[in-house]
């Protein structure tokens, strides 16, 4: 368990989190100073309400001073206006800064997600990552807005009221301070509990968000396999756990405030009792006594908020820990400096071995493979043989633990990631499309927007132009989340068009035609054959009929290269490839 995850963080750790949270406020420090000034003035206006009571009682009702009858009401109106204006100014300014902080933190977290290695996403579910981006970041807003308002305005309100009460009767104020240790004990105990429960609540938000995402995204599978009851019960368990954590949090919050207020009420009761004693009546006027009691009553609500804000602060600090874990996570290693305009396409795997993080099983073992520029190499093998993993090492989604991969004679790590990946186009087995127009999906990632003719050429080559032109908006049609408005074959063809338009010298085709019907597949294969000329192409396919014309076929088994050759050579060899071929075309013997 990391240091930042201890249930009882030290004051130093909390202060470090405060500094990091308020570091996001630094760009807006001028507005922050303005807000603080307005909050202090609003606090002074609040204290002025207690002050005006003494001349109101003594001057207007007891002494019946004609002048007091004029200036006291006018001053009361002025105090109200002053307090209202300063309160509005502080609340609006703090809200603006707080929302800007949320925007900046959320942007920083999202950009960090884009920089993190693939292994990070293997270990963290999308629901958890989305919860950090939305729920946890919003909790930080409490420290940047509501907590600041309470800690500054309400704290200064208490200070000003205490100062005025001391001016009226220092002896009575000592009674109020006498019960201060009780309040401190309650607040300290509540702080530890708040932080612990806040972490648990935020973790449960990620859990039920993930379950909800699974149920919504996989709704077809849920329905066809009758999993509605199972998913509902799974969500109910997590939702109930979150509810319990929330109610425990609310119980601590509800108990801590009355206990702390009890001390203040006891002090008020003692003061009311002492107010009837002659020794007190000789030192303070009736208006002063009423003003003192009014000041104490006015002090209770801000005191309650100051005590209650600890819950928000601890919640924000717990959220801050979670968010800063993301921001502190090491990004993909990218230390290369070698320029790369356009690769020739010579790829070499030199004794490469790889296993996934936190796994002891080697997925790839001692891979030696050289792919010449412009050569089409197909990777085949049983499921789990390492085909897709081998291809994922080329764009450095992962780095091998042993051996070296070279492009044009230089190790991949010598190139900047952006330069390296700009040389590759990928059509993955799991097609990813964005909730945007077809044109933007096909042109995704290009530095310059392609012309309409270029878009049409790419779509035509991918056998997609015909169905695109039949859509009401054509290339401007928004296709929904992950292309939900398109069929599986259409989505695959859009992904191929995207790869065609990028025109990279290296192609990675992972099950690139697996979702196409026979006629479309034939036409796509023709287009891909034209595209692959002069380009280094790595094809991963389970269906051996799609790679019979490859320049070379590499057969993987248990993470090792066991055979290599052309389709005819491997059939004549009567080894692993021939066995796979017989299973696919003749059925198991």
Swiss-Prot record:
Subunit structure and binding partners: Homodimer.
Location in the cell: Cell inner membrane
Function summary: Involved in lipopolysaccharide (LPS) biosynthesis. Translocates lipid A-core from the inner to the outer leaflet of the inner membrane. Transmembrane domains (TMD) form a pore in the inner membrane and the ATP-binding domain (NBD) is responsible for energy generation.
Pfam families (alphabetical): ABC_membrane, ABC_tran
Protein name: ATP-dependent lipid A-core flippase
Family, as annotated: Belongs to the ABC transporter superfamily. Lipid exporter (TC 3.A.1.106) family.
Sites where the protein binds ATP: 381-388
Boundaries of every ABC transmembrane type-1 domain copy: 33-315
Keywords: ATP-binding, Cell inner membrane, Cell membrane, Lipid transport, Membrane, Nucleotide-binding, Translocase, Transmembrane, Transmembrane helix, Transport
InterPro entries listed in its UniProt record: AAA+_ATPase, ABC1_TM_dom, ABC1_TM_sf, ABC_transporter-like_ATP-bd, ABC_transporter-like_CS, ABC_transpr_lipidA, P-loop_NTPase, Type_1_exporter
Top-level EC class: translocase
Domain annotation ABC transporter: ranges: 347-583
Entry text on domains: In MsbA the ATP-binding domain (NBD) and the transmembrane domain (TMD) are fused.
Annotated Gene3D superfamilies: ABC transporter type 1, transmembrane domain, P-loop containing nucleotide triphosphate hydrolases
Membrane topology term: Multi-pass membrane protein
Reactions catalysed: ATP + H2O + lipid A-core oligosaccharideSide 1 = ADP + phosphate + lipid A-core oligosaccharideSide 2
SMART domains documented for this protein: AAA
GO molecular function: ABC-type oligopeptide transporter activity; ATP binding; ATP hydrolysis activity; ATPase-coupled lipid transmembrane transporter activity
EC code(s) of this entry: 7.5.2.6
Cellular component aspect of the GO annotation: plasma membrane
Segments traversing the membrane: 33-53, 70-90, 148-168, 170-190, 262-282, 283-303
